[in-house]
UniProtKB/Swiss-Prot annotation:
Gene3D superfamilies: Erythroid Transcription Factor GATA-1, subunit A
InterPro entries named in the record: Znf_GATA, Znf_NHR/GATA
Organism: Dictyostelium discoideum
Keywords for the protein's UniProt record, in alphabetical order: Coiled coil, Metal-binding, Zinc, Zinc-finger
Species classification: Eukaryota, Amoebozoa, Evosea, Eumycetozoa, Dictyostelia
Protein name as it appears in the record: GATA zinc finger domain-containing protein 13
Basic residues compositional bias, start-end: 269-279
Coiled coil region boundaries: 356-433
Disulfide bonds: none
Sample GO molecular function, one term: sequence-specific DNA binding
Highest taxon in the source lineage: Eukaryota
Primary gene name: gtaM
GATA-type ZnF: 327-354
Amino acid sequence: MENQKKNNFNQIDYFRWADYSKNNNNNNNNNNNNNINNNNNNNNNNNINNNIDNNNSFYRFISPPFNKINNNNNANNFNNINNNNNNNFNNYQLNDGNKISINNILNDNTTTTNTSANQNSANTNKTYNFSKNENGIVYEIDNFILDSNLVREQPFNNFNYLNIINNIQNFLQLISGKVNLLNVILGILVDDVNRYSVNPNSMSIIPSDNFPTPQLPLETNTDLNNTSDCSSTTFSSPPSSAFNSPNLQNDYTQPQNQKSQSSTIVKKNSSKSKSKNNKQSKDDGETNDGESPEIEEKRVIRLDMNLNPNPTIPKRGRPLKVRPFECSICKIKCSIYWRRILINEVRTSVCNACGLRTMKKTKKENIEKKKNKISNILNDHNSEIDNQIIIYLNQKKTTTTTTTTTTSSTNNLNNNNNNNNNNNNNNNNNNNNNNNNNNNDNNNNDNNNNDNNNNDNNNNNNNNNNNNNNNNNNNNNDNYNDSIYSRLYSDDYEDEYYEGEEYENEDE
């Protein structure tokens, strides 16, 4: 199938046989009429096909399934091609055995040539009328009937559509009349194709005089020298009813400003959408006045033939705003209509172009990830703290050996002092008791003095204990005093810390 954009063809609605002798003679010397032999017909036909592809031809070649009657099994070769001005096709037949002989297709100024077709089965004749156009040598075939069953039985490889018309100068430009032809690409038989002829000088379509002219919007190019504009002639695509209608002309009579039904619904107020509308209006056969049909503003739904034309859109979910987004599969950079749906507590977005579902994260997943991050940070921090505690405990084991000796010595001294004081107090009490009978006032004074002495001794002991604690704290690391975690994890420091608080509370 030829490229649709390159050749400006929407559908195969006209079938034409054209003259390629000029292009073939200019492009490939092997394609000259004087050099054709029965031995190298296949090579010449291949060369012709290559030349036509290089020239970007916009013709469709549909030919009847003629098979040659000779000993050669190759059905793609010619039989009895003469190099004179009178070119003869001899001994061709249809698949059912009906012979067709086409003789004396002249290149002079004669208007008509009658040929006959012999049928072995029914012994009847078919008349093929060939005529010339005033603007050029254009031959027309009238009442040419091709059985669709025979066409379907014929293999596709045997259809060499150029064989009947190659290397014959100005042979047939167009098949016309009532023809049943096989639409090879779409597989549809087209009925009642109206007669047309082509002017080879201007490459424009000239309707026949005997048939009415359908109203078709056409673009013609009168410049024959510009080979790059070979695809300038465009045709509007026929409606779907044209393939099954008995009268093709009535179906083709359409208003030129008819709205086109396109698969892409474009929003207003955008320069890109306007350019797309103009291109679509030219392809759909609208007028070139710049008047684009009014299209209702709807959400953009992109439906391409290469993608899923009917995407499944979930019923649940709320519609999102139209936003520019590039799908990961269909790679469409446009505003795609997305829908968000909650499936198994996972949010998904559905692309209407290809039906792709992109998974999105829920809040629960995000919260779990945040928790994991926090726990990882805490674990790292706790590991550092544990390391500090281990270092502290190791240091404490080394320092307690020195501090305990000092504290024990001081405690012993304090205890000795206390004992001495107690002994002194007892002595004083004894003395006081002995003196009670004599002087009550003196006893009271003595008791008061003893109490004061005891309080002083207690204060001295407390001061000694506080000094020892301060010495221990100064000998340890600063982390021991500053770190909150060390107070929580170390039992030794916890006991000392609360003991110190108890002593301080007693002093207060």
